[in-house]
């Protein structure tokens, strides 16, 4: 018997205040980058097939895995830069994005020169370590009066895109070769660098619960919802 590794769906139910008939479910899949390694056929990695029929795609970029970012951030105090083996593994994030493009277009039976309309949110993770690099005062919170301000989303995305073009242009090129609708988002689940801890003689790094302050982690999903189910999410007037 052949057992294949498949991503499990995360299902969330949304209730609309307008009542029955407007409720919906959101289904998320979390794919590892290894699922999109070049040379692996769809038959060998069937867990990637759903991506071609998804209503939206999220791509999480890890700056600490990138040699370009590591050079720019040399001397940063984040302990993740000093972990054993950190920086020695091959950074394939641009290759994974390129392979994602190939898989999606093959499964949709479209030309490699065509682009899909499906929105892609490119999330720049661990953005708290990039605040000095990004001129963080230019990055604004895009939710105003319980509405998503698309103008702010656009401006934030332009700042991130410009930065990525300088630091890792292949991510931008490969993302925009796949979709007509790509936006870039700064996110950080912890909002601060983890700290070194020792437990039972073993050394670890972990976030400090007292310092947890997530950065814009909900914004990519709000933007995606605006495209997938626009009636569920009000946007600021004039956008």
Positions of the model-derived regions?
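Short, small-residue-biased leader/transition segments that mark boundaries at the very start
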Residues: 1-3
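Switch II of P-loop NTPase G domains
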Residues: 6-56, 66-72
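Extended hydrophobic secondary-structure segments that form protein cores and membrane-embedded regions
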Residues: 27-30, 57, 119-126, 181-188
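Conserved C-terminal guanine-recognition region of P-loop GTPase G domains, centered on the G4
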Residues: 47-148, 156-175
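Extended recognition/assembly regions associated with phosphoester-bond processing machinery
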Residues: 85, 100, 104, 202-209, ...
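Canonical P-loop GTPase G-domain recognition
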Residues: 129-225
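Structural and coupling elements of P-loop NTPases
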Residues: 185, 233-234
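Long, low-complexity intrinsically disordered regions
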Residues: 231, 238-239
């Amino acid at each position: 018997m052949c057992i294949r590794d498949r991503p499990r769906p995360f299902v969330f139910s949304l209730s609309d205040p307008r009542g029955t008939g407007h409720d919906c479910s959101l289904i998320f899949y979390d794919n590892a980058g290894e699922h999109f390694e070049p040379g692996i056929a769809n038959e060998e990695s069937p867990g990637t097939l759903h991506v071609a029929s998804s209503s939206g795609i999220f791509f999480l970029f890890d700056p600490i895995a990138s040699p370009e970012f590591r050079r720019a951030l040399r001397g940063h105090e984040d302990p993740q830069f000093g972990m054993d083996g950190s920086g020695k593994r091959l950074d394939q994030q641009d290759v994974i994005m390129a392979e994602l493009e190939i898989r999606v277009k093959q499964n949709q039976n479209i030309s490699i020169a065509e682009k899909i309309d499906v929105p892609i949110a490119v999330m720049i993770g661990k953005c708290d370590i990039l605040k000095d690099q990004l001129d963080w005062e230019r990055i604004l919170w895009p939710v105003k009066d319980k509405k998503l301000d698309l103008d702010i989303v656009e401006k934030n995305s332009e700042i991130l895109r410009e930065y990525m073009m300088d630091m890792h242009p292949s991510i931008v090129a490969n993302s925009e070769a796949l979709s007509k609708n790509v936006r870039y988002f700064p996110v950080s689940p912890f909002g601060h660098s983890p700290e070194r801890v020792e437990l039972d003689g073993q050394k670890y790094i972990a976030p400090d619960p007292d310092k947890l302050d997530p950065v814009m982690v909900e914004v990519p999903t709000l933007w995606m919802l605006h495209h997938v189910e626009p009636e569920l999410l009000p946007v600021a007037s004039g956008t």
